[in-house]
Amino acid sequence: MSSQSHPDGLSGRDQPVELLNPARVNHMPSTVDVATALPLQVAPAAVPMDLRLDHQFSLPLEPALREQQLQQELLALKQKQQIQRQILIAEFQRQHEQLSRQHEAQLHEHIKQQQEMLAMKHQQELLEHQRKLERHRQEQELEKQHREQKLQQLKNKEKGKESAVASTEVKMKLQEFVLNKKKALAHRNLNHCMSSDPRYWYGKTQHSSLDQSSPPQSGVSASYNHPVLGMYDAKDDFPLRKTASEPNLKLRSRLKQKVAERRSSPLLRRKDGPVATALKKRPLDVTDSACSSAPGSGPSSPNSSSGNVSTENGIAPTVPSTPAETSLAHRLVTREGSVAPLPLYTSPSLPNITLGLPATGPAAGAAGQQDAERLALPALQQRISLFPGTHLTPYLSTSPLERDGGAAHNPLLQHMVLLEQPPTQTPLVTGLGALPLHTQSLVGADRVSPSIHKLRQHRPLGRTQSAPLPQNAQALQHLVIQQQHQQFLEKHKQQFQQQQLHLSKMISKPSEPPRQPESHPEETEEELREHQALLDEPYLDRLPGQKEPSLAGVQVKQEPIESEEEEVEATREAEPSQRPATEQELLFRQQALLLEQQRIHQLRNYQASMEAAGIPVSFGSHRPLSRAQSSPASATFPMSVQEPPTKPRFTTGLVYDTLMLKHQCTCGNTNSHPEHAGRIQSIWSRLQETGLRGKCECIRGRKATLEELQTVHSEAHTLLYGTNPLNRQKLDSSLTSVFVRLPCGGVGVDSDTIWNEVHSSGAARLAVGCVVELVFKVATGELKNGFAVVRPPGHHAEESTPMGFCYFNSVAIAAKLLQQRLNVSKILIVDWDVHHGNGTQQAFYNDPNVLYMSLHRYDDGNFFPGSGAPDEVGTGPGVGFNVNMAFTGGLDPPMGDAEYLAAFRTVVMPIANEFAPDVVLVSSGFDAVEGHPTPLGGYNLSAKCFGYLTKQLMGLAGGRIVLALEGGHDLTAICDASEACVSALLGNELEPLPEKVLHQRPNANAVHSMEKVMGIHSEYWRCLQRLSPTVGHSLIEAQKCENEEAETVTAMASLSVGVKPAEKRSEEEPMEEEPPL
């Protein structure tokens, strides 16, 4: 819009005007119309020109006017554009409203059409329904007329015609009934007794209308739902109804025949037999075990549920399925109608520790179950004695329904075991809880005797010929173990009687030298007291001349009553005439005391062997019936004094408790849960088999208190996972919603960490208490070191989050309690589990008094739990006291012995020596041992390597080191590694590492990982700077470098020291090459 200006002030469109001479200026007016003089393309009125003489003064105002004019033009254009824009918007709105009205009209029209179509369809359906009703009514009328016609024909029939003709259905039913009867009769004739198939005699008692005490159908396992011989419904007892023309005599004969058949069944008692025979060979009655009606009630007594088991025999069996578990499962199922996907732990790498494990199909599960049943009997054969009165938890059932729902089998098998018991047999140990016998045996198939596999054909003595044998492995285990235990007891009773007879001969012939008594570790205290009275009376008859009745009997006591000094004083105070008899009696008492002490020691060994097999035995908690002190004869029985607690040996301590075995998923399938009870049971059996357990001191564990748990975990977390279900109901409902239904059918907090409503809280607290007890005994000097065989693990458990099989962090709680109660200033925690201990790191991340060092697979955060990066060094005052030896590089190649030994040599041990701890705690997970699948580890360490790592750590803190079991799921691997660690703790000579490992250099990924860790922590620990050049060396090369360095230092020291100080030193202390004085 702007025009180019000339120097004279005119625009480019204007032509220059010729100046007039001064003579003509005087004759011109002041203003002139120059319209005619302008060019044609310039409008005269558009640009008026001022031709006054004083134009030179108005020329500077021309650009300002032009600018103002341009501004006005711009404003006009803007207003025009604004008006056009408003017009467009109004047009758009008008068209939009028009289109909206059209669309709405079309929508209404469509809805109207749809409604009309629905109305027509509904009307057609109504008409069709009416036609169907009419047709059905017509058919009913026709059928009614047909029946009336038949009835009329029957009324008007002739006398010679038959009154009724059997239909085709009746004939088929009759034929099937006759065939079943013939098959059952032929089967009985072939076997001469009832079939051994449980389905037969369950079905045989189910249909009976005469036997009202048959077990309810709900108690039968799902495996019994197949059609069986001789089984038919109650309505089919008499397939042909009696007609008016049939005589009653025929019906009575049928009833008598049925009663005779039922009397021949071995499941019912025969009342016509003699009483002695019935007591001696009493067949198994279902009503005694599967029903809880009164013992003397008749057939009309109502049955109770199958879960209520009669305690008539003095035993209350353990019911596997508890109401608490049922209620939790019911809450999980009924919450929001269905179970949503699991709200699992979310991490940057892996959400769950078992992600990627192959799923086990039903066929594999069935095969594993058969192998488990095959391997269970050899495991039970090895020195496992089952006491009468105990109840086996059915871990060997063929299906979860048979284990949980089949409550009729458990009392049935228990009653069967009681029937095998002789009348004089009494329960030796009472109060034993459920015994979980794991299916996987530590003993391989090559160690199993061939005769053990024949136990399924074993028929116990005393059983009637018609009584069927149980068909599952659990009942066979009951019977076999029962008989073995009874044979042991009979054998040792005879030996005990011979031993007591020998003692009596010693009393009657004091001049004969005493012989060493035989040892029988299987005897119990009850047997000692049982034979005590029998031995006292003959001894009173043999020594009638003694004056003091208190010395008349030799008592075999549980513990000594008097010390030897007191006995010597009593001898000195006796009269001279009684001194020989008193000395003789003292000799006898000493012999009996020695014998009893030896027997108590053997009883403890027997108790340990039973605990190793998974059977808790406590002799001290049971006291047999004894004579009251107020009775006249009580003076001859001295009072027994409880044994004072003995001080443990200063050696390696072990802690283990069978209650931790009960923490199992309610689905019962251990194949889908790597963290199962067989882990610690196999380790404990391995320690027993190798003899390492006998060299250690076994301590008693306990449950950790809630206050101890809250040293690391929050109060809500402690109450939720550490209390019973009743206390859990008092918590906020949002807290209890963390439990979810697992795909296997059980309950858990995620797909890995299962939850058992009854046993998980107790097992988790017991694991913490066992670790705490062992750590405190080692820290106070009662024990040298220790190994805790505990589960569930704990190093993944955070302050308020359970994960990775862990609920409570046992090692972290023990460290906190050491700080609070014993004022331990420096604690070293080494975690060599293949997974990072995120919970332990969180508990001490800002604590400079606890040095946490973890060796784990990291893979840049792509391995569970995703934490444990090398740059996580701590915070606040704890900076530098959190060392993560994070291996990166995946499994190409996997880490092995050379890499872990190099990490210990260059990172772990130098920092630990510089830290100088007072106590060393080890989160001892063995899932880095070879044999674990990739999701659970994938590394190839050997079990021997962990023995050498343990031996290196024993050089710290004066040897005060405690290992607590964490991860590890391959049974062979964890058993070998545990054996190696316990051997190292005991100070045994370890097997040498292979030469290949000694000369093998760590792989490139491991070297890179160690260099990264050393670079980060070199500013906190000065010892790392000296060892950085030897990271890539093998063990042999590193030892050579250290020897050369030591020789160089020695040579430099000898050159810098003068002769006189050397001579003076030789006089004061020996040199290195001299032998120490």
Curated annotation (Swiss-Prot):
Q: Matching CDD domains, A to Z?
A: ClassIIa_HDAC4_Gln-rich-N (cd10162), HDAC4 (cd10006)
Q: Does the keyword Cell membrane belong to this entry?
A: no
Name-wise, this protein is Histone deacetylase 4
Signal peptide residues on this chain, from the entry's feature table: none
At the highest ranks, the source species' classification is: Eukaryota, Metazoa, Chordata, Craniata, Vertebrata
The region called Disordered is annotated at 132-167, 204-225, 239-327, 508-530, 542-582, 623-646, 1052-1077
Tell me the Pfam families matching this sequence: HDAC4_Gln, Hist_deacetyl
What spans are recorded as compositionally biased (Polar residues)? Answer: 205-224, 627-639
Record motif Nuclear export signal, residues: 1044-1077
Q: What is its main location?
A: nucleus
Q: Name one GO molecular function term.
A: RNA polymerase II-specific DNA-binding transcription factor binding
Name the positions where Zn(2+) binds. Answer: C665, C667, H673, C744
Q: Which reaction does it catalyse?
A: N(6)-acetyl-L-lysyl-[histone] + H2O = L-lysyl-[histone] + acetate
* Family designation: Belongs to the histone deacetylase family. HD type 2 subfamily.
Recorded GO cellular component terms are:
A band; actomyosin; chromatin; cytoplasm; cytosol; histone deacetylase complex; neuromuscular junction; nucleus
Residues in cross-link Glycyl lysine isopeptide (Lys-Gly) (interchain with G-Cter in SUMO): K557
Region of interest: Histone deacetylase:
653-1077
Record comment regarding domains: The nuclear export sequence mediates the shuttling between the nucleus and the cytoplasm.
Cytoplasm: is it a keyword of this entry?
A: yes
Which gene specifies this protein's sequence? Hdac4
Q: Name the source organism.
A: Rattus norvegicus (Rat)
Question: Keywords in UniProt for this one?
Answer: Chromatin regulator, Coiled coil, Cytoplasm, Hydrolase, Isopeptide bond, Metal-binding, Nucleus, Phosphoprotein, Repressor, Transcription, Transcription regulation, Ubl conjugation, Zinc
Please note every region of biased composition (Basic and acidic residues).
132-162, 258-273, 515-530
Q: EC?
A: 3.5.1.98
Q: Which InterPro entries match?
A: HDAC4/5/7/9, His_deacetylse, His_deacetylse_dom, His_deacetylse_dom_sf, Hist_deacetylase_Gln_rich_N, Ureohydrolase_dom_sf
Q: What does the entry report about post-translational modification of this chain?
A: Phosphorylated by CaMK4 at Ser-245, Ser-466 and Ser-630. Phosphorylation at other residues by CaMK2D is required for the interaction with 14-3-3. Phosphorylation at Ser-349, within the PxLPxI/L motif, impairs the binding of ANKRA2 but generates a high-affinity docking site for 14-3-3. Sumoylation on Lys-557 is promoted by the E3 SUMO-protein ligase RANBP2, and prevented by phosphorylation by CaMK4.
Q: Which GO terms describe its biological process?
A: cell population proliferation; cellular response to mechanical stimulus; cellular response to parathyroid hormone stimulus; cellular response to tumor necrosis factor; chromatin remodeling; epigenetic regulation of gene expression; negative regulation of cell population proliferation; negative regulation of DNA-templated transcription
Subunit organization: Homodimer. Homodimerization via its N-terminal domain. Interacts with HDAC7. Interacts with MEF2A, MEF2C, MEF2D, MORC2 and NR2C1. Interacts with a 14-3-3 chaperone proteins in a phosphorylation dependent manner. Interacts with 14-3-3 protein YWHAB. Interacts with KDM5B and AHRR. Interacts with BTBD14B. Interacts with MYOCD. Interacts (via PxLPxI/L motif) with ANKRA2 (via ankyrin repeats). Interacts with CUL7 (as part of the 3M complex); negatively regulated by ANKRA2. Interacts with EP300 in the presence of TFAP2C. Interacts with HSPA1A and HSPA1B leading to their deacetylation at 'Lys-77'.
